[in-house]
Amino acid sequence: MTTIELQIQDNTFLRQFETKVGNYLAKIEYSLQERKIFLTKLIIPEEIRDDEFRESFIKAVLHHIEENNLRVVPTSPQIASFLRRNKQYKELLPVGIRI
């Protein structure tokens, strides 16, 4: 699988991570509480929705979160499923959270 390079924007006003592909906007909505970020909803337009894009988008957002020393609480089923399949991100989970 090839990795797609994405530019991630943290839209703090709308509380969502965004990336634009052509005329389409993919986003992950979040809620920030102390040093934890709750990833609540993954929205990818149907026109750009595929497994490779979804994986690359989630990885890019997790990298951004890691750079900002935050912990991830995945309340979105799609993001929780990604974290279950990709154990290398388990250090981003807060103490006591298992998925």
PLM features per residue range, with description:
Residues 77-97:
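Conserved active-site alpha-helix within GNAT-family acetyltransferase domains
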